[in-house]
Amino acid sequence: MSGSNGANASGNSPRPLPLDARDVELTLQPVERATMLPPAAFVDQAVLDWEVDEIFSGWICMGHVSAVAEQGGFLMREIGRTSVFTTKGEDGEVRAFLNTCRHRGSRILTETEGQVRKRIQCPYHAWSYDLEGNLVAAPHMNEVEDFDRSCWGLLEVRSAVVGGLVLIDLSGEAPDPAEHVGHIASFLERYKVPELQRASGTVYHVKANWKGIAENYNECLHCPGVHPELNALSDYRSCLLYTSPSPRD
């Protein structure tokens, strides 16, 4: 079992990663002699459970702020075992909530993004919430003694907008979002990310461990043949997915 120094994504001391420490150490060697992660990292349920608790509990990017630029615009994501959505309220604030009705626990939103008007309605028993998460309608509950709608609003999740990116923190304990983004903020500013508008999007459903997808994205040895346009902008051997600053920047 390997240990870990520092803090996890939520800012707390992490529990040991359920992989052989020697295998992990080999992946951290200089690239000339480093090895890949062991197979267990991609198929062991205990490893995935560790990742959900130690990685996905902290700041996670939900998407670009343009998706929630208008009142009622929303983004919905499945983060580990938890379904979350963000939306812009009538007061102009972007908030995040658990995508779970307070009545019987039904999923409220099923699309990954879209637009609602002034109400978010559960498809099961039609409980309705305003864009600030307050319960505004609960059919047949007026007959229930001591039922206080103000106590049954959606459960809010800590969120922030940094550099045009909507972030959520399921733990509620992660470090300051600006600290999490760190030096990447300068790149977000340089490319004017908050001002960008998405022209189109493509969704891929892949039956694979998330790290396999991440590794494919982060290595570019395949770029000369598969992505010649990107390869013309960034030397594939540098492993950089952005262009170098010009003397004028």
Regions found by a protein language model. Give the residues of each.
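N-terminal pre-ligand scaffold of iron-sulfur
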Residues: 2-112, 157-160
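A general structural signal for short secondary-structure junctions and capping/turn motifs
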Residues: 52, 127, 149-151, 157-160, ...
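Intrinsically disordered or highly flexible coil/loop and linker segments, enriched in small
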Residues: 60-61, 193, 222-227
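Rieske [2Fe-2S] iron-sulfur-binding domain
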Residues: 68-172, 178-187
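Alpha/beta-hydrolase-fold enzymes
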Residues: 172-174, 178-207, 213-215
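A conserved active-site cap/scaffold subdomain adjacent to cofactor or substrate pockets
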Residues: 198-240
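Conserved small/polar residues in nucleotide/adenosyl-binding loops
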Residues: 242-249
